[in-house]
Amino acid sequence: MKGKKPSIEIATSNPSLPEDLVVSCLARVSRLYYPTLSLVSKSFRSLIASPDLYKTRSLLGRTESCLYLCLRYSPEDNPRWFTLCRKPNRRTLSKEKNESSGNLLVPIPIINSPPLEWSSIVAVGSHLYAINGPIEDAPCSNVSFLDCRSHTWLEAPSMRVAHTNSQLDGKMYLAGSSENVDSLNCIQVFSTKTQTWKPVPFQKRIFGVGDLEGKIYTICRTECGQGVTIKPKDLTCDVVGFCGEKDWSSVCMIGNIVYFYRPNGEFLWIYSGKGESARRNLKGLEGLPKFDDYASVKLVDYGGKLMVLWDTYVPESESKEKMIWCAEISLQKKCNNEEIWGTVEWFDAVLTVPEDCKFVRAIAATV
């Protein structure tokens, strides 16, 4: 009688990969998939929020724009934040009718989220800086920032002078409201690297050419629709006409070009230079649906592309809901830069919200 063959035990355990290898792999994945990957395990959630991951992404040249949408749900005091997420089974481009693009806005847990007291929010790298608005009609100098890597709100140093408006160009430039507005001393500069504020120096406000670059655009929300550009290099100002536009909620700047949407359905762009400005229609946009007259429309600089968000009410909805839609549009200059054409890469309904939910801000950070 033959003896039984000895049983062979097969190891089924799956040893963990070294953490640095996992980080290297995750750094090569688009951040659009991170909200889904964070659901895999607690360790994945920890890695996706780790500074090492984003350092690796930067070293590998894998940083990308990340869309954030801030909404206000009545009667809540604190806003809710959402980010664009892509389903893992998303196809390259949805060309079939009624086929979803696979893009969604998903809620993100925000730690220490402040109430909606800020009047402006600007993106500098992976941080979103919220500049507090007036409290009981008094200018406020408080500044908070959202770290888009860990989704945590932190406090930045307070401004030396309370502000009225803000723009940025690598650094943030804020027009103060507590000093002589005719003096350039009311302009403050915030270095996001050193986390310090400084005014434009007093003696004719002369400073190093290497410290400040480009232009600062400040829009005056008046019927004349005028704005001012400040050139830190030359210490000169130009008045820019914006053709009498009053609604600046649907506007963004990409490079040196201002894009805006008008309620009549037009997308326009303005190039400003040498004291002159020209307004032209954004051409192309084939396939982009017509927005409702009542729609709230937001434009975002999405890494050089134009991201458009708008809302539509859900017909015959018993729960009184509305849909938020999103479109990604690539831009191309033609005819010696006299024309700009937009190509709709995708558009889709990305979120369902109560109909009394309000747009607060749409913005993109680089992570």
UniProtKB/Swiss-Prot annotation:
Q: Where are the Kelch repeats?
A: 127-171, 172-216
Entry superkingdom: Eukaryota
What would be one Pfam family of this protein? Kelch_FKB95
Q: Which UniProt keywords apply?
A: Kelch repeat, Repeat
Q: Where do the F-box domain residues begin and end? A: 11-57
**Name by which UniProt lists this protein:** Putative F-box/kelch-repeat protein At4g39600
